[in-house]
Amino acid sequence: MLKISIYLIIVNISALIYAENDQYVLLVSMDGFRADYLETTDTPNFDKLANNGVRSEGLKPVFISKTFPNHYSIATGMYVENHGLIANSFFATDLDKYYTMRDRETVENGNFYGGEPIWVTAERQGVKTASYFWVGTEAAIAGVHPSIWKRYDQKVPFDDRIDSVMAWFSLPMSHRPRLVMLYFHEPDWTGHKYGPSSAKTVDQIQRMDGIMGTIMDKAGKLSIADKLNMLIVSDHGMTEVHSNQIIDLSVYTDLSRVKTTGAGPTVFLSAESTKTLTTVYNDLQQLPNAQVYWKRDIPDRWHYRNHERIPEV
């Protein structure tokens, strides 16, 4: 009996030492933060972070360069054709359902999300995770949620999000997440509305630098500050688009014959009849400054062909 008691004490002490040496990760995404934004205006807090850590030249997003596919690729390490979240909005032929980022029911349906995101892997290993608005965390993927997660609400002030994250890192060890994922919709929202080179976007970049400063200051006061690793990422960049660059597909073909999904630089076309789709495909060969592909001909380098949800054109 004495030997068993001593063994249990040793195990408990070892577990405590291991837990106290655990590292923590805060993964922060600032949507649409183009790599060269850091050169367009003063960003002292980002500069400080880079000077005391490691900075990459930029991120090469997966195709398509949209928010939902790229955030989920960051979380899974998979290309879009592998995880199946093929766009912000799409029709999932395997589920016979539409997915759209503004539809609460679909966003929280784990069947849309393939692969295994990092929080699922961690939770299965007994590592607690938390998310403030990261794509996919609102769904039970393979039956697993982060230990702590939030339903998306863009109106939640950035400071409130930061305070919640710091509170999570201050929880008792038994409830404290070791991986926290935090999402901000800026400067993407401002860039889309006013353009990436606008004065308002520059102002927003400066604001996000201030947000970064707040995160660093508050994180530095945590009891786990010396064990906290911060990663700052973005999902894609942005470029100027002018009205004379907009292409109206209906000028070139009768869109009533096909089902269209997607928007912006990428549009998907499908139809019940292959003959109809072939006619539309041939019509669209006239498009200026655009390329039309059959699914089978999509370039290998885009890793955007081998999933049943990707439409034929």
Can you describe what each PLM-predicted range is?
Residues 21-26, 52-56, 82, 124-130, ...:
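Loop/turn elements at helix/coil->beta-strand transitions in domains of secreted/extracellular proteins
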Residues 77-195, 288-289:
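His/Asp/Glu-rich, glycine-adjacent segments
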Residues 25-29, 36, 57-60, 73-75, ...:
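Structural recognition of the beta-strand scaffold that forms the well-ordered cores
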Residues 36-83:
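Short, structured active-site-proximal loop/turn typified by the sulfatase FGly-forming signature C/S-X-P-X-R
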Residues 158-170, 187-228:
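A long, amphipathic alpha-helix that forms part
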Residues 261-313:
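Active-site neighborhoods of enzymes that stabilize oxyanions during catalysis
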Residues 27, 45, 207-249:
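Metal-dependent active-site segment of extracytoplasmic phospho-/sulfohydrolases and closely related
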